[in-house]
Amino acid sequence: MKLFIDTANVDEIRKANDMGIICGVTTNPSLIAKEGRNFKEVVKEITDIVDGPISAEVISLEWKEMVKEARELVKIHKNIVIKIPMTQEGLKAVKVLSQEEIKTNVTLIFSAAQALLAAKAGASYVSPFLGRLDDVGMDGIKLIEEIVTIFKVQNIVTEIIAASIRGPIHVVKCAALGSHIATVPYKVLVQMCKHPLTDIGIERFLKDWESVPDK
């Protein structure tokens, strides 16, 4: 399973990229707004850091305007993937962009039915939201399992990006189920690096090393 980072903070992206653990980035209007910078400038800077798919989301809700925005965004860099909301208008835009060989990531997926429709429309990626489902008492991991099964049975080539990741357990479970990708906040990537027994082990090694004579 590939790991993307879910952020628009270029410092976080650099740190994750320097660790060699990510191969793509997902952003959205909320993440861009947190940075307080020009949208296209941020996206361009991200493409300079990570050599992989960079998802940038359209703002329009009408399909013709989505297509227009998408055509402008892909001019920024060859790695740009257009994030499209899972709506009827969004599916129309995905169909057109797919015919133009512009990659799309259909976002705000909360059911297997939505994922199937997005794939049929020609989406390159679908992004089911685990954490938000968990927040309302539903099972986000179960959704990933359903989509993985359907895509395998139907030989669908659309890749699954597990999104709205809240902790390391989400990442591990998605990997076990066969999700192609998980897009992970920086803080969760940091959490994945840590374990109390690792810290204890390092402390013990250092203490033992201090007792070694003639180092």
UniProtKB/Swiss-Prot annotation:
Subcellular localization: Cytoplasm
GO CC annotations on file: cytoplasm
SUPFAM superfamilies: Aldolase
Pathway: Carbohydrate degradation; pentose phosphate pathway; D-glyceraldehyde 3-phosphate and beta-D-fructose 6-phosphate from D-ribose 5-phosphate and D-xylulose 5-phosphate (non-oxidative stage): step 2/3
Coarse class of the protein's main subcellular location: cytoplasm
The organism's place on the tree of life at top rank: Bacteria
Active site location: K83 (schiff-base intermediate with substrate)
EC number: 2.2.1.2
BP terms from Gene Ontology: carbohydrate metabolic process; pentose-phosphate shunt
Pfam family, one: TAL_FSA
Keywords, in A-Z order: Cytoplasm, Pentose shunt, Schiff base, Transferase
GO molecular function: aldehyde-lyase activity; transaldolase activity
Catalytic reaction equation(s): D-sedoheptulose 7-phosphate + D-glyceraldehyde 3-phosphate = D-erythrose 4-phosphate + beta-D-fructose 6-phosphate
Listed HAMAP family: Transaldolase_3b
Family the entry assigns: Belongs to the transaldolase family. Type 3B subfamily.
Entry function: Transaldolase is important for the balance of metabolites in the pentose-phosphate pathway.
Protein name: Probable transaldolase
UniProt gene name: tal
